[in-house]
Amino acid sequence: MRVVVAGGGTAGHIEPALAVAEALRDKHGATVSALGTARGLETTLVPDRGFELHLIEPVPVPRKPNMDLLKLPFRVAKALGQARKALKDTDAQAVIGFGGYVSAPAYMAAKSLGLPFFVHEANARAGMANKLGVKLGGVGLNAVAGSGMEGDVVGIPIRAVLSGARDESAADRARDTWGLDKDRQTIFVTGGSQGSVSINKAVEQAVDQLVEAGFQVLHAVGKKNELPAAKPGYHPVPFIDDMQAAYTVADLIVCRSGAMTVAEVTAAGVPAIYVPLPHGNGEQALNAQAVIKAGAARQIDDADFTAQTLIDATLDILLHPSTHQSMSDAAKTSTAGNASTVIADMIAATIKSQHN
């Protein structure tokens, strides 16, 4: 059984692809390869997880008419040729895409080669590449209802290791790695792989009061941002590859509300303060609404996110054990069954039905 997954650029597109890839490999013995671009995180994440990566040209679709729009047909043609070659080289029997720059060429290549293909939309508002995939005949799979893309609701695929009981031995190892104090509650802050200027600024201004209140801060500032000086109770790092370890030590997470992030944080059972990215098609403002309504998280809009609003929300959660516990409980009960296995089973069944 040979499957190609397509999802590149950001972790939000790559992680669900890898979660399904692992389920296909581990449960069905499938040989799985990935499509990606040379400029995305997949260049490290995919090989690190044991999968072969095939690179194609990214095909970003301009949101406004400009010169890049005139180049789009040529970019699509080149990427389509590269995607077709990758599918032929791997002798793929099925394809699944997760949005992002590589998905549209993957869908078109699968269509042109007569391969079954699947389209997973993690966000509350579907992107253009995935809508195109379904229109081309792909099987639509939504994380939530009402995304604007046709298809069944299956949830978001996450790694199996992210769900389940907290591993205290793993937490101890993670604390040792980052120099964290076991006796202090930990606030984990991340703005994603590239970081967030607004989140970083507020955290750096708030950190002294947070530490004075008895907490410690693990702060992933982003690979391209200047690393602040560490000080007692404040542990800045450029980027964290092992998010599972960070979730394990976190008592509270402050982060953007990408669909994959929300799914992972919720599965980990950690209370969160979400700061939606105020760009794109507005999907981040919608992604966390279900868990917020369930009581598992709070939301502060980017325009309102300051040192003071961060301090106020953090103290309200961490200084009141009953509040913190109720949020954690709500997160655990909000987690649906892992979609990775469901999707892997669908792909495997489709391949088997075509070869019987």
Curated annotation (Swiss-Prot):
Cell membrane as UniProt keyword: yes
GO annotations of cellular component type: plasma membrane
Pathway the protein takes part in: Cell wall biogenesis; peptidoglycan biosynthesis
GO biological process terms, semicolon-separated: carbohydrate metabolic process; cell division; cell wall organization; lipid glycosylation; peptidoglycan biosynthetic process; regulation of cell shape
Domain of life: Bacteria
EC number: 2.4.1.227
Keyword terms: Cell cycle, Cell division, Cell membrane, Cell shape, Cell wall biogenesis/degradation, Glycosyltransferase, Membrane, Peptidoglycan synthesis, Transferase
Reactions catalysed, as given in the entry: di-trans,octa-cis-undecaprenyl diphospho-N-acetyl-alpha-D-muramoyl-L-alanyl-D-glutamyl-meso-2,6-diaminopimeloyl-D-alanyl-D-alanine + UDP-N-acetyl-alpha-D-glucosamine = di-trans,octa-cis-undecaprenyl diphospho-[N-acetyl-alpha-D-glucosaminyl-(1->4)]-N-acetyl-alpha-D-muramoyl-L-alanyl-D-glutamyl-meso-2,6-diaminopimeloyl-D-alanyl-D-alanine + UDP + H(+)
Top-level enzyme category: transferase
Positions of UDP-N-acetyl-alpha-D-glucosamine binding: T10, A11, G12, N123, R159, S193, I240, Q284
Subcellular location: Cell membrane
GO molecular function: UDP-N-acetyl-D-glucosamine:N-acetylmuramoyl-L-alanyl-D-glutamyl-meso-2,6-diaminopimelyl-D-alanyl-D-alanine-diphosphoundecaprenol 4-beta-N-acetylglucosaminlytransferase activity; undecaprenyldiphospho-muramoylpentapeptide beta-N-acetylglucosaminyltransferase activity
Membrane topology: Peripheral membrane protein
Keyword Cell cycle appears in the UniProt entry: yes
Annotated CDD domains: GT28_MurG
Family stated for the protein in its record: Belongs to the glycosyltransferase 28 family. MurG subfamily.
Function: Cell wall formation. Catalyzes the transfer of a GlcNAc subunit on undecaprenyl-pyrophosphoryl-MurNAc-pentapeptide (lipid intermediate I) to form undecaprenyl-pyrophosphoryl-MurNAc-(pentapeptide)GlcNAc (lipid intermediate II).
PANTHER family, per the entry: GLYCOSYLTRANSFERASE (PTHR21015:SF22), UDP-N-ACETYLGLUCOSAMINE--N-ACETYLMURAMYL-(PENTAPEPTIDE) PYROPHOSPHORYL-UNDECAPRENOL N-ACETYLGLUCOSAMINE TRANSFERASE 1 (PTHR21015)
Protein name: UDP-N-acetylglucosamine--N-acetylmuramyl-(pentapeptide) pyrophosphoryl-undecaprenol N-acetylglucosamine transferase
Lineage: Bacteria, Bacillati, Actinomycetota, Actinomycetes, Mycobacteriales
